[in-house]
Amino acid sequence: AGVLAKKIFDYEATIFQGYEFIGIKGSTGKMSGSTGLNLTPATLLNIYQPEVILWLYAKSEPNKAFDFCFDDGILRQYFEFDKQYKSYLEGTADEYVRDIMNSCLMFEEKIKLVPMSHLVQLGSIVDFNVDMLETVFAKIGTPYRYEEFKDRLGLAKYWLENCSPENANKLCPVRNWKVYNELDGKEREAVSLLHKELSENEYTLEEL
């Protein structure tokens, strides 16, 4: 192409820059029109904050492939993003990280760095109940409030329920008779006493 451009059009051809494919981790194949495996921005925005998507592109050289992760690799990506963003805010980031962050940050408002892994793990335990999440965060020494984790809460819930449902904690809708029938007499009595105590008395979440 370079020779043709020069000899026929007397024009110096532009330098070719090849781009690697973007992978889809947690799914089979690569993102390509020829394979029919494509992701829309709307799909990615169900699990990624916009800045994290831009960060993945900004930190990757054109000739280096990277993955959009639908498996637990996404938690590592959020962790790495948070680490770089924190160093950027604190002024300890090197020039490379500063350039990346300047390329991917969209708004002047600061991003709330509530760990995505915590939202997934703890959110699953309390069924993503906001009040209970705030209580649990306070109990473990990280008193995040809803205003701080609201931007990521829906993303964490969507990812867990749609991309990693096998890791979700679910309360049984009915009694697990299989387990109950394997209990001995003392164990069944203990379960009955616990049920009676909880049902006949009112307890706050704090007391429990």
Where are each of the predicted segments found?
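Helix-rich, typically C-terminal accessory recognition domains appended to large enzymatic cores
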Residues: 118-128, 132, 186-208
